Structure formats: structure tokens, C-alpha cells
Amino acid sequence: MPRALWTAWVWAVISAFTEGASDQASSLSCDPTGVCDGHSRSLNSIPSGLTAGVKSLDLSDNEITYVGNRDLQRCVNLKTLRLGANEIHTVEEDSFFHLRNLEYLDLSYNRLSNLSSSWFRSLYVLKFLNLLGNLYKTLGETSLFSHLPNLRTLKVGNSNSFTQIHEKDFTGLTFLEELEISAQNLQLYVPKSLKSIQNISHLILHLKQPVLLLDILIDIVSSLDYLELRDTNLHTFYFSEASISEINTSVKKLIFRNVQFTDESFVEVVKLFNYVSGILEVEFDDCTHDGIGDFTALTLNRIRYLGNVETLTIRKLHIPQFFLFYDLSSIYPLTGKVKRVTIENSKVFLVPCLLSQHLKSLEYLDLSENLMSEETLRNSACEHAWPFLQTLVLRQNRLKSLEKTGELLLTLKNLNNLDISKNNFLSMPETCQWPGKMKQLNLSSTRIHSLTQCLPQTLEILDVSNNNLDSFSLILPQLKELYISRNKLKTLPDASFLPVLSVMRISGNIINTFSKEQLDSFPQLKALEAGGNNFICSCDFLSFTQGQQALARVLVDWPDGYRCDAPSHVRGQRVQDARLSLSECHRAAVVSAVCCALFLLLLLTGVLCHRFHGLWYMKMMWAWLQAKRKPRKAPRRDLCYDAFVSYSEQDSYWVENLMVQELEHFNPPFKLCLHKRDFVPGKWIIDNIIDSIEKSRKTIFVLSENFVRSEWCKYELDFSHFRLFDENNDAAILILLEPIDKKAIPQRFCKLRKIMNTKTYLEWPTDETQQEAFWLNLRAAIRS
């Protein structure tokens, strides 16, 4: 019994393990190229069953704690491995030994407290390694990266426990495109630790305090192109001139991101620019200046200029004591060499005239997302301000008058590019004044409703996107590029107004269509972006767009940007894929064909009516409908005749000389209705026939070959036919005056033919001895 329990327990464990492994393997989604995605799947281990077909494996943001020697041994073609944001605390020595093709490895934000060089000894082609955010204090006892000759991007350190950088740490690395060191709590930096790296393109340094900053800078200043300092409090920073005076520097760009300054530390940083003479660009991003701009009493007067700095960028500068801040006049003399200045989203409402006049080399000025208005712009763009300025960006400020703005900028003689987008202009005056060299103007998102002659005729590039324009009728003879997307235009602009236009962006309007003739009217058009409009996919439009292969080279957003809005059955489809029916595209031909078919149908109907007496049927239907309006059966007192006699004119002798004599002169006499004597003059013949039949108890048909050929006999027979079979009575008496073939009776009198086949009719005897019996039978039939 215990043995059985033990066996059951073992099988349960094996089953659970197998099921778990299967579940984990199924949690990966892999495409045919070998890219497998398993991020954020709550995995607690690396899935089993991985093969050589896997080239990219993403297991980030899971709960993996351990990487074993066999977990990845079959992934010999793996190039990208992402294990970041897990709980990994252990990596076995040979875990990555078989990954000889690995180029990208991310182990960031795990729980690794120790790093081993054996992990990387076979990763000769590794280019990217991220070890940020783990728990280690140092980079190991031995040189960690000595086996990585092709490494180009390295990220190491953490924000808490990483405290020491030793000389051996970066041995073996000669060239890095990017090195990021997170060392907010750095306590020890051994000199020359970074000096072994001969060239670093971009160094990102996270330091909370600046104590060791100068030591690091001394080691890298001759091999570094681009230094980025993050999350640092520079309140206590002091620049020692002696320590760096002998160094040949190569740093070209310096960025301070989320860094705090004081008036004093800012001066120390400016000193640095004089000695690191290669710096061409300085950027302050999301920084805080804890001071009031009081530089006059400091050593700023010993600094003649900002080194060789040509580009100065300031974004989101916070000044807690903004309303106590000085006028900065003491730094004006330092700005003479600066060519490009960007001060963005920093609550700037004024550039003092004196500062503008000192910026003698300035070519580009960006004051986006600030508080500039026409009143302050008047002071900023004063006489002799920014003498060489070519580009001015005043996007998203507080400008309201286009006329005043243009007038205030007349002092800028060299200005050719002006961006005043996202200001609230609303309207445009009829005339304006602009600097004489204006070539580019950005008026996008200014809520203007129409364009006027206010725009300068010298423009080569105009952006009026995202406004309320419903037409474009300006003559701009030099305009080469027009950006007019997201407006309310219904058609392309007139090409005669824009003779040299080469680029037009007109997407997001309400244009229904455009034609080959319209595009051909722009002789120099090379790029057209017209997607996102409400295209009516007519036959002509589809034929044009789908039939012009060269059109794809002009339409930059073809084919995905072009969708049909109508007809409804192709709405939402790409114009390239839409198909219309033959009737929609060849309406005239279809209508002609239908008309021809209708004509043939009418012709055929006429032939059939003639052949099968269709006209007769219609006449009879009309007569029957007329007769239906009268009482179905005349009252007894309205019957005037014993019988109505229907006969052919050729048989009138027999009727008038024999029948009338035998019936009307008999005692008692019969009263007959004959059309010759009893029809009412002036009354329609058809009405006479109908009235006579209805006023007679019987209808006598004198049948002969002449009767069958007589048109009026047919009418009389027709209406009696309706009476007989609509009222279902036996009012008809047939007299066969001479033998006739029953087939000679028209097919349309089917019921009459049936009577002749089923009921007795009187036949006129040629033998005189039998004629008396004939008249006797006829009188009896009339009385019945």
C-alpha cells in the first residue's frame, strides 16, 4: 500500500510538471520569422521546448527568478533576448554559453546582486547589454566586459546600491556608441576607470551629487563626443581650473536633464565652457534654477564668452523665485557667438532689447510655448535686434494680430522663415507688411477662416494646416510648397494661382474627387498628399487613379490614405481596391441597351398581340368593365325582345325573309331585335349591341362562313360570350346555316367552342320537308 501511494505521488508530480511546461510553452506567440513574444505572461521560468528556430525572445515583465544552463541551450540562432523587469536573482555560469549569435541582451531591473564575466565569455558578437536596475554594488571582481569586443551600447548601475567604479570595470572596451551609468549614490570613483575606453559617442551619467563629477570628466573629456548629465543637484559644484587646463577636449555637446542649479553653480558650469572649448551645443531640459540671476558680484566678469557654444537649448526651465529674477544683463556679453537659441515652455514673456542687440550672430530663435505678445515683441524685436536672424519660431504664444506681428518684425531684415502657428489670430486683414526676404510662413492652427492678400508674395513655403479654410484663391507666383491639410476645402486649388508648386499636402479636407486634368495643370508637382478626404469613387475617378501607374510616385500616402466615402457599398474600401458594377460605370450604354430591349419587347408584344388577338382581349376587357357597371341582369320589365339575332350581312336575306316571317308572324308572335331596324341611331355600335343583348331573353347566332369573317358579328358574339359565361346562363341559341368547320371559330371563343361540342345546336336543313320541324324547334328554344 505505501508503495502504491508513492507511485501515485510521483506520477502526480510528473503530470503537474509536464502540464506546467506545456502551459508555459503555449504562452509564447511566435511568428514564422522566429520572433517569439512572451512578455507580461506571469511566467515564473523560461519556457521549455525552445528550439534553434527562435531568433528573438521577449520574456520581459514576468516573474522569472532563475536562468539555468539548459534553459536556452538549443537557441543557437538567438539574436535578441529580453529578460528585463523580472525577479531573476540567479544566472548559472553557462546559461548563455550556446548563444554565440546573440547581439542584444537585456537583464535590467531584476534582482542580480553579483555579476559574473563567465556569462558573457562566448558572446563575441554582442552589441547591446543592459544591466541597469539590479542590486549589485560593483561590476564584479574581474573585468566583466573583456570578452565583448563588439559591444556598442552598455547600460550599468542602479539608483541605490551601486557605489563604486574601479579601474578594471571597463577594461577591454575600446569604443562605445552609448554608455549609461546610473550611480546616484556613487561614493568611490577610481581615477582612470573610464580612461581605458578610447572613444565614447554618448555618455549618460546619473549622479545625485557632483562630488566625483569633475574626476569623471577629466578621464573622459578627451574621448567623449556627447555628455548627458541627469538627475543631479549641482548646488555644491565647483570647477577647478587647474585640473582641466592641460586637457585636450573633444566634447561637442553637453545636456543637463533634470538638474538643479544655483546662481553660483551656474557660473561654475559656464567656466567649464571656456576650458572645454570643443563644446558647440548646450541643452538644459527640465532643469531648476534655485536663484535670482544675481551674477554681477561673482566671477562672471572673468568669463569673456561661452567658449565656442553655438547652440543653446532650454526646455521647461523652472525658476521658483521667478518674480525676483534679475534682468540677466551681466550675461549679455557672453552671447556674441551663439547662433541658435531655443527657449521652450519656460514662461518667457520678453527678450530685452539690449539682449537682442547683443545676439549679433543669432540665426535661429525658437520661443515656442511661452507668453510672448505683440506688446513685448515690440521691445524684443527693437532696432538692430538679431541682425542676422533668419528663422524665428513664436509657436503657441499670445499673439492675436497678424497685422501688428508683421509690422513689428520689419526690423529683421534677414528674416526668411517665420513660424507663428498655434496663436489665436482668428482673422486675416486685407493687407500686411512683412520683412522683404520672407520665404517661409507657418500659420497652422491659428483658427483663421480665409486667406487674403496679407500674405507676402515672396513666399516659397506656406503652412496653413488645421484652420477653417474652405477655399484657396491666392496668387503666389513663387510658392513651391503648400501645406493646407485639415481644413474644409472641397477641391484642389487653381493651378494658375500656383505656377511653380512642387509639393502640396491637402489631406483631411472634404475633397470628393480630383482628375488627371487637375494634376496635369500643376506642371512641377512632384508630391501630393491628399488622403483622408471624403472621396466619391465614381467610375471616372477610379479609372483615373487605378489606371495611372505613375500616380503612385506623386501621391505620397497612396494607397492606404485614400478611402471611398461613396457609393455606400464601397464605403471604407481603399480607392485602389474599389470596384463598381457595369451599370454604374456605363450608364448611357446600359440605358441605351434597356431602351432597345424595351423597343424589341414592345415590338414582340405587338406581333404577339396581332398573332394571338391581344388587342381583342383588351377591347373585350374594357367593354366587360363597362358592362359590369350596369346591373348584371335587367329586370323582367326591361326585356323588350324575345331574341336578339346576330347574323352576317350576307345572310340577311335568310334572316329577314324567312326567320322574321316564321317567328314574328306566328301566333303568338315573337319579337326579334335586328340591328338594321332596331339599333338606336347616333348611339355607339358597341353600346347598341350591349343594350340589345341585355334587353333580349335570348341571343340567336346565325352561324355561317360569312358570320365568322364578319367583324361586327364578332363583337356581337364577344359580348354575348361575356353574358353567357359571366352570368352563367343559357341565353344563346346557335343556328348553323351552313356546314362550317369548328376549327374556323376563333380560338379566343374557347367556351363557345365548348358549347358546340357539348350542347345541341340547330342546323338549317336543305330538305324542305324537314324545315317545318326546324321552325318548331326554334320556337321552342326561344320560349324556354
Curated annotation (Swiss-Prot):
Residue spans, topological domain Extracellular: 21-587
| Reported modifications of this chain | Ubiquitinated at Lys-754 by PPP1R11, leading to its degradation. Deubiquitinated by USP2.
Q: What domain of life?
A: Eukaryota
In Swiss-Prot or TrEMBL terms, this protein is called: Toll-like receptor 2
Residue span of motif ATG16L1-binding motif: 761-778
Q: Where is this site: Interaction with bacterial lipopeptide?
A: F349
Q: Which organism is it from?
A: Capra ibex (Ibex)
Domain spans labelled LRRCT:
525-579
**Domain TIR residues, every copy:** 639-782
Segments on the Cytoplasmic side according to the record's topology features: 609-784
Q: GO CC annotations?
A: Golgi apparatus; membrane raft; phagocytic vesicle membrane; plasma membrane; receptor complex
Instruction: Please provide the Gene Ontology terms (biological process) for this protein.
Output: cellular response to diacyl bacterial lipopeptide; cellular response to triacyl bacterial lipopeptide; inflammatory response; innate immune response; toll-like receptor signaling pathway
Query: Which subcellular locations apply to this protein?
Result: Membrane; Cytoplasmic vesicle, Phagosome membrane; Membrane raft
Quaternary structure per UniProt? Answer: Interacts with LY96, TLR1 and TLR6 (via extracellular domain). TLR2 seems to exist in heterodimers with either TLR1 or TLR6 before stimulation by the ligand. The heterodimers form bigger oligomers in response to their corresponding ligands as well as further heterotypic associations with other receptors such as CD14 and/or CD36. Binds MYD88 (via TIR domain). Interacts with TICAM1. Interacts with CNPY3. Interacts with ATG16L1. Interacts with PPP1R11. Interacts with TIRAP.
- Bilayer topology term: Single-pass type I membrane protein
What stretches pass through the bilayer? 588-608
